[in-house]
Amino acid sequence: MSRYRGPRLRIIRRLRNLPGLTNKLVESKKNQASGSDQSNQKKVSQYCIRLEAKQRLRFNYGLTERQLLNYVRIARCAKGSTGQILLQLLEMRLDNILFRLGVVPTIPSARQLINHRHILVNNRIVDIPSFHCKPKDIITIGAPKTYQSIITKRIEAFAKDQIPDHLTLSLSEPKKPKGFVNYLINRESIGLKINELLVVEYYSRKA
């Protein structure tokens, strides 16, 4: 299954707010329903609940079905909580790191910067959005002038307290902001509200 490129509002109306996909906020159809309407709704099956959690994770991080399944398989083979390791793998992707640093408004826009070869990791150009960042990695945003003003305005508007503790943003060189990966992200700093166990359960027979 290919990556979704359709209207983003349609997705967040169905799956609720996804900060990585879009910074627009909408009230989901579930919340818009009146009390009488809710009482008439059929009971949602456990499969549908797990499917929705999986879809929220996939669309927020901009993954294909195959990519997410591969991440689940990697998480299952690692020591520790499969769900937390899965979230860790997704949060440590280069495109997500740029998003969490506040350099770009969404993960798709981070992916564009990376694909255009404007991002360096440890002084080497990386053009793979799924690149796995590690502690002590240094990420340099070497965007051309056309991007610099946009990035500068974005960083100025982004509150520093929104940057999670495992990351640090340095503006000592305004034209080349740098991000530092301090350590692996912990569960409390995950940017998406989700029950990762539902995702693991969804893939229990596939991974």
Curated annotation (Swiss-Prot):
GO CC terms, sorted: chloroplast; small ribosomal subunit
A matching Pfam family: Ribosomal_S4
Gene Ontology biological process terms, A to Z: ribosomal small subunit biogenesis; translation
Domain of life: Eukaryota
Domain (S4 RNA-binding): residue spans on this chain: 92-156
Keyword terms: Chloroplast, Plastid, Ribonucleoprotein, Ribosomal protein, RNA-binding, rRNA-binding
One annotated GO molecular function: structural constituent of ribosome
Localization, UniProt: Plastid, Chloroplast
Entry-linked SMART domains: Ribosomal_S4, S4
Quaternary organization: Part of the 30S ribosomal subunit. Contacts protein S5. The interaction surface between S4 and S5 is involved in control of translational fidelity.
Protein family according to the UniProt entry: Belongs to the universal ribosomal protein uS4 family.
Role of this protein: One of the primary rRNA binding proteins, it binds directly to 16S rRNA where it nucleates assembly of the body of the 30S subunit. With S5 and S12 plays an important role in translational accuracy.
Protein name, as recorded: Small ribosomal subunit protein uS4c
Organism of derivation: Equisetum sylvaticum
